[in-house]
Amino acid sequence: TDVFDGPLQDSEFAGTGGVDGGAELKGRGEPIAYGGPCFNCELAVVDRANLLLAYGDGAYEDLAALRDRGSPLTEDATPVAGEYSDDTANARATLGGSPSPNSVLTGDIEGDKRGGTWRRTAPDILREIAVTRRGIADPAGIDTAAFDALNLVAPGPVGLWVADGRQVMTADVFDALVASFAGYWGQRRDNRLTIGRIGPPVGTPVARFGPTEIISIRPLA
C-alpha cells in the first residue's frame, strides 16, 4: 500500500556542516541498523573537522567494534589516536585522532533501541518500522496475534543494515525481513498490518501428481 511505498527514512543530511553533515552528504539519508550485530558496516563521516561518525539515526544498543581499514580501534570515553568514543543515545562515534589516508571506517553495529528495547527478531523489527517510521498505530493498526505467532515460529535474531535510509523503500525492507522466515506481509481488509509464514502442506492429500501424470503445464488465463 501507499504508506509503505516511500523511503524507509523521511529525514536527510542538510549538508550545512557540523552535525548536519558536509556538502558531500547533502540529501543523503542517515544509516540505519536493526537487530544484529550487523557486521562490517561502513559508517558515515558526518563532521570531518571534529572526527564525528554516524552509524544510526537514534538510540542504539551498541557500536560493538570499530575498525579503520580493518585495524581495530579501542573504545574510550576520552579517546586519543587509535581510539574512539561511542554515543549510543544518538548513534554517533567520535575518533580520537585523524583516520589513516584513504580510510574506510567499518563497525559491528547492534541496532535501533528506541523506547529502550533492542528488537532482534524479524517480526519485531518489521512491526517497529511500521509504527515508528510509517505511522501505523499500535495495536490498532497491527494484527498482533499474527506477529505474536510468528515470533514463536521465527524467534532467531536477524540483522538489517541500510547505509542510506533515503535510498531504500520500506516495502523492500519488509520483503527482505519476511524472506528470512519464508513469510509474507500485507494489510487485511480492516487495514491492519499482518504477516504470515508459508509452511509445508499439512493433512492427507486428495490427489497426487508427478512426472507420469503431468504431461504439460498450460496456463488457463
Enumerate the predicted regions with their spans.
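Interface-prone segments of viral and bacterial extracellular assemblies
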Residues: 1-221
